[in-house]
C-alpha cells in the first residue's frame, strides 16, 4: 500500500459497509500488520512493516529503519473517527468541534475502546465496552456544543439512556 495509501486502508472498507474487513486488518498479527510490531515489543510506530523480523531475530536495513515514524500512524485517525466515533462536521458552522458527531463502531475481537479529544471548547470523551450481551457506551461533550449520536443498534433489542441530557430524536432506534 505504501506511505500515501495507508491512510485509506481502513477507512475505505469502512465507508463501503465492510467494517469487519477493516477490523480484521487492524487485528492482523502477522507481517504486515499493526499488531506485528506490538507483539514484537514496539511501543511506537515503525517506519517499515518488517523493521524487525521475528523469525530470524534481525533488524531491517538501519539506513532506512526508524522505530519512531509516523508513516503507518494514520491508524490513529481511524481509531478516533471510527472506533471511538469522534468527528466534527465539514460545514463552517460545524467546524472546530462546535457541532460534534459521535458514531462509534465496534467489531472484530475488540471488547472495549476509550479515548478523548481535546477541542477549543473542552474535552470530548467516548468509550464503549462489551458486557454480557450488551454494549455500554459513555460519552461526554463540552459545554456550548451540540452532539449528534448515532449508535449501531440494528439487530439489538433496545437502546437505553441511563443518564445525561435530553435525547431529542431517537429515530431508527
Task: Mark where each language-model region is.
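Generic helix N-cap/helix-start motif at coil->alpha-helix transitions
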Residues: 1-6
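Conserved small-residue packing positions in alpha-helical repeats and bundles
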Residues: 9-10
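Non-catalytic C-terminal accessory modules of carbohydrate-active enzymes
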Residues: 20-173
